[in-house]
Design a protein with these regions (language model features):
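Short hydrophobic "helix-edge" motifs at membrane interfaces and signal-peptide entry regions
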Residues: 7-8, 70, 201-202
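Short secondary-structure junction motifs
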Residues: 37-39, 93, 97-99, 180, ...
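Hydrophobic residues in alpha-helical segments
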Residues: 32, 91, 284-288
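Active-site SXXK
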Residues: 22-29, 48-50, 74-105, 110, ...
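Short beta-to-alpha loop/turn elements within the nucleotide-binding domains of ABC transporters
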Residues: 54, 100, 212
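Short, surface-exposed loop or secondary-structure junction motifs
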Residues: 3-4, 104-315
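Short, conserved catalytic-motif segment at the N-terminal edge
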Residues: 12-75, 95-97, 111-119
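N-terminal pre-domain segments of enzymes
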Residues: 1-11
């Protein structure tokens, strides 16, 4: 694959110490030799130039298939920024407001309850109270919605999440939201930062406000304009795909979703413990660049400042 970013002749040209880059390479090789990881691709860029682009180890250790700079990885929760920028694009276009109640787009969230003392492991009953204020789109973007992951909350709320089968891979985004609408939040909206399903719900907001499926919005409005040809949802080129290594304890390779099929549930923010929905190679650095530098036109400067700004004092 071609990288359109120029290469630095020497790391020092962009203010990086070559001996420290060598330490990174040595550390990775050591971890690969010890079996901690099967392989890795490292890309370090600074001042608009690539200072380091190197592949280490194997993309499939059991098949002894070497890692390459254009190996495709499942990027798990790195899908979150794509979903968040999609929402910011719609906000820029006036199709949603960050201050809007989520219930404006998802009526299922109009009368949510909040679990009381949800983290208490000794609680005997899942007590609930009304929301003190409505959940907003801004809450979804900054993970202050009160939504969580089942494994990050107390036993009673975890049991409720699992009973509702929130992580069902056969469901649609709309079906997932309908289930969440029947469950209490872990915290009052705006009161607590909690990594969780906020971005999954934001993905459904994008679908409603944008009038199309989340995966199609991301591909057509973000990936194609940026030239991210190897980034998307769905089929992965098996000849370039990184594979999980065999679990030494079981002797089995961890199961992976069949990427030859388009999933019904386009989950934009699955945690690292689950399979990812999106795939990408080292061109992901172009995405990072375009969300940080003014030359990107995926979002206007004021919106980019909101994306990378601090939000803990905003309510």
């Amino acid at each position: 694959m071609a990288f359109d970013m120029p290469r630095a002749i020497r790391p020092a040209e962009v203010g990086l110490a070559p001996e420290r880059l060598n330490r990174l390479a040595d550390a990775l090789k050591n971890d690969i030799d010890k079996g901690f990881v099967p392989g890795a691709v490292v890309l370090i860029a600074r001042r608009g130039k690539i200072a380091c682009l190197e592949a280490f180890g194997y993309r499939d250790r059991e098949a002894r298939a070497p890692m390459a700079p254009d190996t495709i990885f499942r990027i798990a929760s790195m899908t979150k920024p794509f979903t968040s920028v999609a929402a910011m694009m719609l906000a820029e276009e006036g199709k949603l407001l960050l201050a809007d109640p989520v219930a404006r787009y998802l009526p299922e969230f109009a009368n949510l309850k909040v679990a009381v003392d949800s983290d208490n492991p000794s609680a005997k009953k899942l007590a609930k109270e009304p929301m003190r204020r409505e959940m907003t789109v801004h809450d979804l973007l900054r993970h202050t919605s009160g939504l969580t992951y089942s494994h990050l909350t107390g036993p009673l709320l975890k049991k409720a999440y699992e009973a509702a089968n929130i992580a069902d891979e056969k469901q649609t985004n709309a079906e997932m939201v309908a289930k969440l609408g029947e469950l209490p939040l872990a915290y009052q909206p705006g009161s607590t930062w909690q990594y969780g399903l906020s971005t999954d719900v934001l993905g459904r907001v994008v679908e409603v406000a944008g009038g199309t499926d989340l995966d199609r919005f991301i591909i057509e409005r973000i990936c194609k304009p940026l030239g991210l040809a190897d980034t998307g949802f769905g089929p992965i080129d098996a000849a370039r795909s990184a594979q999980p290594q065999v679990d030494p304890a079981s002797g089995n390779r961890p199961p992976m979703r069949d990427t030859a099929l388009r999933p019904k549930w386009i989950a934009p923010a699955v945690g690292a413990h689950r399979e990812a929905e999106a795939k990408a190679d080292a061109k992901l650095r172009r995405w990072r660049q375009c969300t940080e530098q003014d030359r990107s036109r995926r979002a206007a400067p004021d919106f980019r400042r909101q994306v990378i700004g601090r939000h803990e004092r905003n309510g």
